[in-house]
Amino acid sequence: MKIVNIIGGLGNQMFQYAFAVALKKENPDEAVYVDTHHFNYLFVKKYKTSNLHNGYELDKLFSNIDIEKAPISMLMKVTNYIPNFFLSRVARKVLPKRHTEYVAKLSESQTYIPGILSLAGNVYYEGYWQVAQYYINCREELHRAFVHPKPNEYNARLIKEITNSNSVGIHVRRGNYLLSPTYSGICNL
């Protein structure tokens, strides 16, 4: 069984989903899940995380996302992890140790790791997986998955207005800097 942790903003979620699709293609006879429990309200509230952006967005923005979310029972089989810090500590002490390969790839080391898609046994993947080499064999599946649904009436009117005029869009990414104690005060608009 393979589980890919999904966390971060939309771009990171798309990379992680793509990695899960690549895992599924490389291991067709094995179950592949994504772990979205970090977007759970209680987790966010307890750990006061501010890096979860708009929550889990893939299902909201793309109509062809096709991968199962790992239920807590699957996480327990692979990691003894329960989305509650206290219960996880108890589970790790009481339950038998799981023989799980835990793979964490730092976002700073954006290098391709040969063979990582074909690790045997239970594997929990945590990282951003932002290297195109992982997805070479599943390009078509990703193109089908990342299709926006048909715009609703309001958005269709906006699209028409934008295309019929000289429009400029500006995006200021200030949330990361406004809320983070590390970067506070850099962007104080």
What does each of the following model-derived ranges do?
Residues I6-L10, H38, W129, R174-N176:
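Short, flexible loop/turn elements at secondary-structure junctions
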Residues D29-E30, N64:
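Short, well-ordered coil loops that connect the C-terminus of an alpha-helix to the N-terminus
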Residues E30-L42:
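A short beta-strand-loop structural module common to alpha/beta enzyme folds
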